[in-house]
């Protein structure tokens, strides 16, 4: 009897996370989109050289773009290519998804936040959150709930000993 090899690689497929977005916004919906990348960017992403903490998604002429995302070029990158680490990158989505996002932004006053960057097979994908901004008191409430959950877990763990 022959064992089948697992197709899943060891380790995580996540390249970068935007924890700040979950703190700053109420995430209503999550959408997956592809990205238009250059060769040196893909090589840098394989090394994990990405930061999406300050990134945001905007719509222009019916297309979606991500701005503020930094992909640091590798030292051994090609010399004939000028690498711009913070360039605006186009997102690849279907027309129906783009129209849906545009409608939600215009009608409901929502915003688009980049949540995570990850590998899906050999393609780089970005997870976009359709979000609404939090007020300061909402952020405080979330922190209190998180602290209370930690305290409950600590008490339960000590009571089971």
Curated annotation (Swiss-Prot):
Name the PROSITE patterns for this protein.
Answer: SSRP (PS01317)
Keyword terms: Cytoplasm, RNA-binding
Give the residue spans that cross the bilayer: none
Q: Which domain of life is it from?
A: Bacteria
Q: Which InterPro entries match?
A: SmpB (IPR023620), SsrA-bd_prot (IPR000037), SsrA-bd_prot_CS (IPR020081)
Subcellular localization(s) per the UniProt record = Cytoplasm
> What is a single molecular function from GO for this protein?
RNA binding
- A GO biological-process term: trans-translation
Q: Which GO terms describe its cellular component?
A: cytosol
The UniProt entry's sequence similarity note says:
Belongs to the SmpB family.
Q: What does this protein do?
A: Required for rescue of stalled ribosomes mediated by trans-translation. Binds to transfer-messenger RNA (tmRNA), required for stable association of tmRNA with ribosomes. tmRNA and SmpB together mimic tRNA shape, replacing the anticodon stem-loop with SmpB. tmRNA is encoded by the ssrA gene; the 2 termini fold to resemble tRNA(Ala) and it encodes a 'tag peptide', a short internal open reading frame. During trans-translation Ala-aminoacylated tmRNA acts like a tRNA, entering the A-site of stalled ribosomes, displacing the stalled mRNA.
Protein name in the entry: SsrA-binding protein
Organism of origin is: Vibrio campbellii (strain ATCC BAA-1116)
